[in-house]
């Protein structure tokens, strides 16, 4: 609020070169007016108002103003904590580390993220209420897995719950949920929705981070996947699936899955099928050193996944697949800042303008499929336009000419605004 009034705080960013998140062509000499948490004006004519009116004025001096960045595949709790902390650390420390990482992620310019596994609904609530700073979060809550699936982090001789065993540690902290059979899958999906999930995350194949499942494994029967999709659809939202292989992707699409997470081992026919079905491909431009696996089995799986990246991006472009960008950094807190490096790496596969569009309005189009589970649906995300959320970054330099600028936000982001609040100001 403006001091002494009930009016929302007004801010004017003057003389900006605006990339609106949609159009590759920027607009010069633009004033952007913010009232409260929303953009209320984008004008090539000077906007009236100054400090005497209680207005915060920021002179962009012709610099590049863009929407806040987004990441379609984070594990915020996983970014912030190591595997040993997950398995043995105090639960309170897990959440403390997560809240601290949320602030660091916001300072990297990520104003919105879709969390694909972890108990982040309470973190989202605290951030949305202004208790802590961090990005907007679309939580999936626990990753749902079959026994011996990608999100089964129990120890090898632990007795599964199906045979009378206890939940694993990662289930106790709501990072994963192991569920076998249609009734338990339905219950698991509904459990995550009860806890505040915007969308549902199911694991349908092997992965690099998991110990018991080679990459070629098919996980969950078609009936189990359809059950998850039905339960999510009944709540007005969708299912996203961790899956790499053609067979796994085909099973997911046949069951009505909306978002294919990863897909790095797909063939061209499978990518064309994603386009035909109108589904999304949520990809990550992995390099081998993004993750560090100490054992040769998981290291080899990581290499195989990374080797598929170039072809899949090419086929996705060729077939017009709706593609989102994310990172999927997990269980290595020291690697969390690579989020910015991976965003810049998107320029290896798309033009810089296309990459920036995907990082802003493109990802937002996927997030919005959560329907009424999207608690931010009162305004547009990922754009600079009248009525949009006021999530903005002022960049020293031109990322359309040099996308590597976004890899170093500490140096190159002069101003970060989220929901009309200044997070960083070195303008």
Spans of model-derived segments:
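Histidine/acidic-residue-rich, glycine-tolerant segments that coordinate divalent metal ions
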Residues: 119, 128-251
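Active-site gating loops and adjacent loop-to-helix segments of metal-dependent hydrolytic enzymes
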Residues: 77-94, 103-106, 141, 147-174, ...
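Metal-associated gating/positioning segment near the N- to mid-region
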Residues: 63-129, 148-154, 223, 255
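C-terminal cap of metal-dependent C-N hydrolases
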Residues: 16, 373-427
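Active-site core of metal-dependent hydrolases
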Residues: 203-311, 318, 322-324, 329-331, ...
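Histidine-rich, glycine-flanked metal-binding segment
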Residues: 2-11, 18, 22-66
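His/Asp/Glu-enriched, well-ordered alpha-helical/loop segment
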Residues: 234, 307-399
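Divalent metal-dependent hydrolysis catalytic cores, especially in the metallo-beta-lactamase
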Residues: 97-123, 134-143, 197-210, 238, ...
């Amino acid at each position: 609020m403006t001091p002494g009034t009930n009016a929302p705080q007004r801010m004017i960013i003057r003389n900006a070169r605006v990339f609106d998140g949609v159009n590759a062509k920027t607009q010069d000499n633009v004033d952007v007016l913010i009232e409260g948490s929303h953009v209320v004006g984008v004008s090539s004519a000077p906007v009236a108002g100054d400090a005497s009116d209680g207005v915060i004025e920021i002179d962009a001096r012709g610099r590049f103003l863009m929407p806040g960045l987004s990441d379609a595949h984070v594990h915020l709790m996983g970014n912030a904590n190591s595997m040993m902390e997950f398995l043995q650390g105090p639960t309170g420390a897990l959440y403390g580390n997560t809240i601290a990482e949320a602030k660091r992620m916001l300072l990297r310019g990520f104003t919105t993220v879709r969390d694909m596994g972890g108990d982040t609904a309470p973190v989202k609530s605290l951030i949305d209420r202004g208790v802590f700073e961090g990005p907007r979060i679309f939580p999936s809550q626990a990753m749902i897995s079959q026994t011996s699936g990608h999100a089964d982090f129990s120890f090898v001789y632990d007795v599964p719950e199906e045979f009378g065993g206890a939940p694993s540690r990662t289930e106790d902290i709501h990072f994963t949920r192991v569920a076998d059979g249609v009734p338990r899958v339905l219950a698991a999906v509904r459990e995550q929705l009860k806890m505040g999930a915007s969308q549902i995350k199911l694991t349908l194949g092997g992965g690099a981070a998991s110990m018991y499942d080679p990459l070629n494994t098919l996980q969950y029967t078609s009936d189990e996947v359809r059950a998850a999709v039905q339960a999510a659809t009944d709540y007005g939202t969708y299912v996203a699936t961790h899956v790499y292989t053609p067979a796994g992707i085909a099973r997911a699409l046949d069951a009505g899955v909306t978002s294919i997470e990863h897909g790095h081992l797909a063939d061209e026919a499978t990518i064309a099928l994603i386009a035909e079905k109108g589904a999304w491909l949520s990809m990550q431009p992995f390099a081998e050193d993004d993750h560090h696996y100490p054992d040769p089995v998981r290291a080899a799986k990581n290499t195989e996944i990374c080797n598929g990246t170039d072809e899949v991006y090419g086929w996705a472009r060729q077939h017009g697949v709706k593609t989102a960008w994310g990172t999927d950094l997990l269980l290595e807190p020291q690697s969390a800042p690579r989020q910015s490096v991976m965003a810049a790496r998107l320029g290896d596969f798309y033009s810089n303008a296309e990459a920036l569009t995907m990082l802003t309005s493109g990802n937002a189009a996927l997030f919005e499929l959560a329907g009424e589970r999207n608690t931010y649906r009162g305004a547009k995300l990922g754009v600079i336009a009248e009525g949009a959320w006021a999530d903005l970054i002022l960049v020293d330099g031109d990322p359309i000419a040099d996308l590597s600028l976004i890899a170093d936000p500490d140096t190159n982001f002069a101003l970060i605004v989220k929901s009309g609040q200044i997070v960083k100001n070195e303008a």
